[in-house]
């Protein structure tokens, strides 16, 4: 009696497990995804003992495991369905036989065996899950490799373009870096050159400052000397007579009385009446003045003498060359006359052979005189001979004029050289006489004027490019009333030398 209700209860439990609607599953699988494989208890008796009639649903799968278990959900469910169907069949068969043969102990043994089978299946399931996870990872790697292998040509072209742009940018960056380095080197060189220039300018400025200091000191010394000289001047004026003082005050700084004369007058200790200088001082001053004048005249005479010697040498050389050329021309003319005479002698011999000399010998003295006198027929030949002679004379005159012009140019060159030497010596003398002029401010101007006259050369003002103009300038030199040297030079050579 007890076995019958037990079988009915087991059938109810099996019906409850087979029917999804009994446990509230409306087709969604109790919150599970369709096709999923989840753990389901196989033994109905253990289910009843642990949970009773209401069995709790299995836990939901985790998110990381959802995707890994999807491929095996269907196979797991299929395996469990097979096992559950076999269990159901066995239970039904056992339920039919349990009423007669099986007991509780046998059922327990079978349940224990079923649990062992479930554990074995669990271990196999775990191994298969691990294999599936490895295969899924391999599939992921293969998918990523396939995605990389299936990269489009557009991405490849873009990659090539980016690589080319990168190379071009690297080249531009290298060029810009080289330019920057070059500019830096150039700027460094420019900076060094400017630093050197600034240093040079500083050195030059220092030297110029030192020179300026020296010049300022010299100017101060000169001013002090000028003050001393002014004081001496006033003292010398005080020592002179009233008339001489008036003359010195009325006239300009350059007077006939030189500083040397004033020094001589002031050096004399014997004074005349009224503080005037004595006669011996005046005589010494006048003699000193005469000595200076004579020295200056002597120098001018020496210069004029040297210039006369130079001009004489130049003209002598020119005249010797002219005479040599004239002698050569005379020799050529003599040779021509000899040739003409030989030709006439040969013609006469030919005429004698032809019988002309008999008629010529028969000419009387009157015929010979008529032949000598010019006639109308012979006037043309004579005119031709005269024209030839005039042309020859004109050519000779032109040659002489050119030779004289060359001689004059040589003379002018000598004179210019001499004038330059005189200017150099005069400049050196002026440099030497600067302190003397400061110590004696009342030096007369006639010495400077004579030096200027000595340096003046009227030949320099004449143009030497045209020979005839040079000859005219020699014949009629310009006269300067202030300079006696030009008069001596104009009279140094006679006018007959130019026309022989």
From Swiss-Prot:
GO CC terms of this entry: cytoplasm
Disulfide-bond pairs as recorded: none
GO molecular function term, any single one: identical protein binding
Protein name: Coiled-coil domain-containing protein 125
Extent of Polar residues compositional bias: 92-101
Record's compositionally biased regions (Acidic residues): 10-23
Lineage: Eukaryota, Metazoa, Chordata, Craniata, Vertebrata
InterPro entries: CCDC125
Region (Disordered): 1-105
Domain of life: Eukaryota
Annotated localization: Cytoplasm
Main location: cytoplasm
Tissue occurrence: Expressed in many tissues, with highest levels in spleen, thymus and bone marrow.
Keywords tagged on the record: Coiled coil, Cytoplasm, Phosphoprotein
TM region(s), chain numbering: none
């Amino acid at each position: 009696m007890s076995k019958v209700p037990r079988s009915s209860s087991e059938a109810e439990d099996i019906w409850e497990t087979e029917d999804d609607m009994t446990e509230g599953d409306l087709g969604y699988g109790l919150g599970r995804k369709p096709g999923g494989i989840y753990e389901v208890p196989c033994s109905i008796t253990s289910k009843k003992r642990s949970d009773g009639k209401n069995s709790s649903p299995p836990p939901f799968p985790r998110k990381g495991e959802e995707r890994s278990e999807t491929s095996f959900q269907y196979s797991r469910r299929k395996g469990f369905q097979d096992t559950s169907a076999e269990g159901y069949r066995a239970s039904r068969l056992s339920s039919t036989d349990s009423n007669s043969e099986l007991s509780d102990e046998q059922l327990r043994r079978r349940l224990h065996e079923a649990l062992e089978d479930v554990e074995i299946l669990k271990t196999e399931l775990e191994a298969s899950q691990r294999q599936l996870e490895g295969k899924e990872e391999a599939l992921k790697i293969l998918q990523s490799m396939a995605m990389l292998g299936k990269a489009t040509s557009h991405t490849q072209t873009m990659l090539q373009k980016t690589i080319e742009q990168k190379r071009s940018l690297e080249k531009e960056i290298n060029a810009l870096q080289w330019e920057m380095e070059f500019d830096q080197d150039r700027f460094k060189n420019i900076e060094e050159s400017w630093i050197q220039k600034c240093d040079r300018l500083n050195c030059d400025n220092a030297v110029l400052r030192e020179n300026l200091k020296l010049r300022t000191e010299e100017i101060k010394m000169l001013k002090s000397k000028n003050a001393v000289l002014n004081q001496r001047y006033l003292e010398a004026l005080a020592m002179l007579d009233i008339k001489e003082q008036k003359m010195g005050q009325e006239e300009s700084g350059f007077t006939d009385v030189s500083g040397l004369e004033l020094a001589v007058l002031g050096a004399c200790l014997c004074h005349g009446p009224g503080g005037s200088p004595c006669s011996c001082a005046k005589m010494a001053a006048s003699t000193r003045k005469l000595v200076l004048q004579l020295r200056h005249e002597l120098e001018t005479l020496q210069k004029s003498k040297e210039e006369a010697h130079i001009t004489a040498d130049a003209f002598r050389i020119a005249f010797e060359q002219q005479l040599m050329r004239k002698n050569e021309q005379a020799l050529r003319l003599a040779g021509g006359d000899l040739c003409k005479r030989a030709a006439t002698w040969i013609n006469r011999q030919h005429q004698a052979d032809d019988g002309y000399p008999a008629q010529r010998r028969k000419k009387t003295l009157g015929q010979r005189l008529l032949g000598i006198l010019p006639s109308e027929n012979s006037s043309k030949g004579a005119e031709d001979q005269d024209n030839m002679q005039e042309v020859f004379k004109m050519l000779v005159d032109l040659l002489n004029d050119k030779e004289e012009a060359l001689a004059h140019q040589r003379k002018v060159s000598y004179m210019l050289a001499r004038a330059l030497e005189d200017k150099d010596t005069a400049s050196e003398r002026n440099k030497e006489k600067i302190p003397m002029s400061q110590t004696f401010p009342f030096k007369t101007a006639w010495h400077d004027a004579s030096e200027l006259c000595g340096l003046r050369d009227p030949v320099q003002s004449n143009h030497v490019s045209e020979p005839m103009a040079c000859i005219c300038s020699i014949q009629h030199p310009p006269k300067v009333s202030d300079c006696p040297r030009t008069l001596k030079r104009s009279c140094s050579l006679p006018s007959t030398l130019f026309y022989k």
